[in-house]
Amino acid sequence: MMEENTIGKIQFIERKITTKSSDPVRRKTFAEVISPVNNTHITNASRIKRFLTDLLFPRRCPVCGGIVLPKGELICPGCVKKLSFVKQPVCKKCGKEITSAEREYCLDCTKHKRSFDYGRALLNYNDTAKKSMADIKYRNRREYLDFYAEAVCLRYGKLLMRLGADALVPVPVHPSRRRQRGFNQAEIFADRIGERLGIPVCPEMLVRRKKTAPQKQLNPKERLHNLEEAFAAGAGPEGGTRVILVDDIYTTGSTMEACARALLRAGVKNVYFIAICIGRGQ
C-alpha cells in the first residue's frame, strides 16, 4: 500500500509542477516524493558529500542526460514519469510485480528454486531504464549511479538496515570485462549504498572466475547452465555471515542464483539482494 501511495504522489507532483500557481507553496523534492517517511537512515556524511558534489559538478538527469534543474533535485521533474517504479503486489521472493495480490510468487520463482532469501528492486526494466543502464555501462555515465543509490536508499533503506547484513557484495564482472570497461557498475552502486547506509562493502567476498557468453540471448535454463561455476567465494565469508548482493539488473534471476549458491557453499548464512531494475513478473 505504501508503494502504491508513493507512485500516486509522484504522479501528483508531475501534474503540479506543470501547473502555474500564485500560491507560495514549496514544491516537494523527488526524495520527498519517492519516500515520504523520515529518512534518518541516510548518513549526514552522505548528505554533505552530495551537497558539495552538486555545487561543484551539476547533477545530470539519468533519463535525458541534461543538467537537472532546479539545483538540488535528483532527476528532471518531467523525466520522473518515464521511470516505472515497482509497486505492489510483488513476488515475495524476487520482488517482481505480479498480476494478482492473491498470488505470493511470480511464475519464475514458482518454477525455479531460489537459494537467496529474497530481494527487491527499484524500477521495472522498461525502455527508459534499459537506455539508462546502457549509458552507465557503455557510455561511462557512472554518475547516474549516485541517483539510483539515493533512490534505492530512500525507498528501501529501512528494509536493508533491518536485515542486519554484515556486508554489501557487488556481483562481480570478469577481470577482462572490467579492464575493457574500466569499472564494475555493481561495485560503484554498492559503494554508493554503503556510504549512505553505513554498511561495509566487500567486493572481495565474491569473484568471477569464468567469462561467460552474454546472458540476454539465452533462455532461463541456458542462462543458469552458462553461469555454472562462473562465481566462487573469495576472501571474507564466514559461518553466520549475512550479505546483500548488489547488481544493476535482475531479469530471470540466474546470475543472482549462481552468486547465492557460491556464497552459501562457503558458509554464508543468509543471502538477500537489491537491484536497480527488474524484469516484469507474471
Q: Residue locations for each model-derived region?
A:
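Glycine-rich phosphate/pyrophosphate-handling loop used in enzymes and phosphotransfer proteins
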Residues: 2-282
